[in-house]
Curated annotation (Swiss-Prot):
Residue span of region Disordered: 136-183
InterPro entries reported in the protein's UniProt record: Hepatitis_core, Viral_capsid_core_dom_sf_HBV
Summary of the function given for this chain in its UniProt record: Self assembles to form an icosahedral capsid. Most capsids appear to be large particles with an icosahedral symmetry of T=4 and consist of 240 copies of capsid protein, though a fraction forms smaller T=3 particles consisting of 180 capsid proteins. Entering capsids are transported along microtubules to the nucleus. Phosphorylation of the capsid is thought to induce exposure of nuclear localization signal in the C-terminal portion of the capsid protein that allows binding to the nuclear pore complex via the importin (karyopherin-) alpha and beta.
Lineage per the UniProt record: Viruses, Riboviria, Pararnavirae, Artverviricota, Revtraviricetes
Gene that encodes it: C
Main location group: virion
Protein name: Capsid protein
């Protein structure tokens, strides 16, 4: 069977594969991030979202894989065979788990649409010949689409605001999630 774990989320293994292997943090860092941001929701018996469910499953699979790897490591007498197994797990399965964890943590953190736009932007950037693309890759961020970033040197900015211009009294709009309810 050819199962794509990203299909129901609007992405694909092919789209994720545009990101180089060294882009993804270590499994340990991703697990720590998931625990720090979403522990309550992940441990909750309530259904929060499909991303929470997928994240739970990826974490459980990694735990089982580590149990198996430990057993194999303890029971294989031949060091060369043991090294082959460890390298295979780290190279192949480790990368797949890192990709899954990153995708679902990013979707929960930034929103699925933002992550999908980022993957498409990065895919276009990486496939553009170096001579024709900007030097820096796109960056996944929480900037809203309406934000305008001005380039340096276009028009000089005033150092002080005009006396007629008043600062807004309303607090800045923030994209925030209460830590109490992660769902």
């Amino acid at each position: 069977m050819d199962i794509d774990p990203y299909k129901e989320f609007g992405a694909s293994t092919e789209l994720i594969s545009f990101l180089p292997a060294d882009f993804f943090p270590s499994v340990r860092d991703l697990l720590d991030t998931a625990a720090a941001l979403y522990r309550e929701a992940l441990e909750s018996p309530e259904h929060c979202s499909h991303h929470h469910t997928a994240l739970r499953q990826a974490i459980l699979c990694w735990g089982e894989l580590m149990t198996l790897a430990t057993w194999v490591g303890n029971n294989l007498q031949d060091p060369a065979s043991r090294d082959l197994v460890v390298n295979y797990v780290n190279t192949n399965m480790g990368l797949k788990i890192r990709q899954l964890l990153w995708f679902h943590i990013s979707c929960l953190t930034f929103g699925r649409e933002t992550v999908l736009e980022y993957l498409v932007s990065f895919g276009v950037w990486i496939r553009t010949p170096p001579a024709y693309r900007p030097p820096n890759a796109p960056i996944l961020s929480t900037l809203p689409e309406t934000t305008v970033v001005r380039r340096r040197g276009r028009s000089p900015r005033r150092r002080t605001p005009s006396p007629r211009r008043r600062r807004s009294q309303s607090p800045r709009r923030r994209r925030s999630q209460s830590r109490e309810s992660q769902c």
